[in-house]
Amino acid sequence: MSDTKGSDLNEDSALEFDEESYHESEDEDFDPSKEQNKRKTTNDNKKTDVNANISDSDQDEDEDEEYDEEAQEEEKKYSSIVSESGGLIKTRRARLQEEHDALKNKYEQIDIAETSGKSNDLWRQLKERALSRSQFNGSVMDQDAGSITDSMQEQKILIERTYKFAGEVIKEKKWVLRHSAEGQEYLNSIKFKTGTLDKNTVPPDTVKNTQAQQTEGKQNRVNEAGRLLKRHLKRPPILEQIIAGNLKPKLTTLEKSQLDWASYVDKEGIHEELNLHNKDGFLAKQDFLNRVESSKDQKYRELRKLQLQTEQQKQ
């Protein structure tokens, strides 16, 4: 029992061994040469670590210096980029402006050399040839235009109107086509004929008669003694005054609107279209209704006559 207790105490004492009070030199198998080698290796390792740290720092510094130099060079290059419009960065508008200026000023830097005598002579000959050609073409076109205008003048009539409308005397003078709406309206309206438009409108005999009557009237106003007579001459008829142009016919609103409509139709050139798609107006409808009523009355009279005849036969 005592032996077992002693072994237990030795184990406990071994467990309670203090590591700090332990020295390797106190061991029996201690070798001092190994200790020195070990110390040398640790020192060498420390030196290599320090040198590695120093080399890493130097390399980082070198890289930083190289980066700074490259950045400075890039900054210098960037600072030298200046566009013509004054900005560092060339925008789309600046590029468009440069293209526009280049197109606008592309002939400013061209050197104009003196032309030779042959080129001047050649240029003069070309100009003379072009001028003669234009004169020839112009003369041919003028002749064609003259013939066309002559043919058109044959189909046109001159309208001269002098009428009073809304308290104002209106004078009109223009050429219109004979087959146009305004021309037909003028030819159909006897009331507004003045005699200077068409030779058939006013016969020359009527004009001569009116002039002779006026001269005779002036001569009859003076007797043999040279005194003026107080008798009144016969007033000329209204139709002759209208023909002679002394009396201005008055135009109603309906007649004026009809005249304006005819001129508008000729101006727009819709005469044929109106004739093609004409559905008749108010007057045409009234004429149609009057014809229907007259036909009804005629049929009623015929039936009434037949009825009377049958009654007479029965009696």
Curated annotation (Swiss-Prot):
Biological process annotations from GO = chromatin organization
Question: Residue ranges under compositional bias (Acidic residues)?
Answer: 9-30, 57-73
Which residue windows does the record flag with biased composition (Basic and acidic residues)?
31-49
Where are the residues of the annotated region Disordered?
A: 1-84
The chain positions of domain BCNT-C read 233-310
Which compartments does it reside in? Nucleus
Which UniProt keywords are given for this protein, alphabetically ordered?
Answer: Activator, Chromatin regulator, Coiled coil, Nucleus, Transcription, Transcription regulation
Q: Which residues form a coiled coil?
A: 56-115
Asked if Coiled coil is a keyword of the record, the answer is: yes
Q: What InterPro entries has UniProt attached to this entry?
A: BCNT-C (IPR011421), Swc5/CFDP1/2 (IPR027124)
Q: Can you quote a single GO CC term?
A: Swr1 complex
Query: What is known about what this protein does?
Result: Component of the SWR1 complex which mediates the ATP-dependent exchange of histone H2A for the H2A variant HZT1 leading to transcriptional regulation of selected genes by chromatin remodeling. Involved in chromosome stability.
Spell out the subunit comment.
Component of the SWR1 chromatin remodeling complex.
Family label: Belongs to the SWC5 family.
Give the protein name, as stated in the record. SWR1-complex protein 5
Q: Organism, per UniProt?
A: Kluyveromyces lactis (strain ATCC 8585 / CBS 2359 / DSM 70799 / NBRC 1267 / NRRL Y-1140 / WM37) (Yeast)
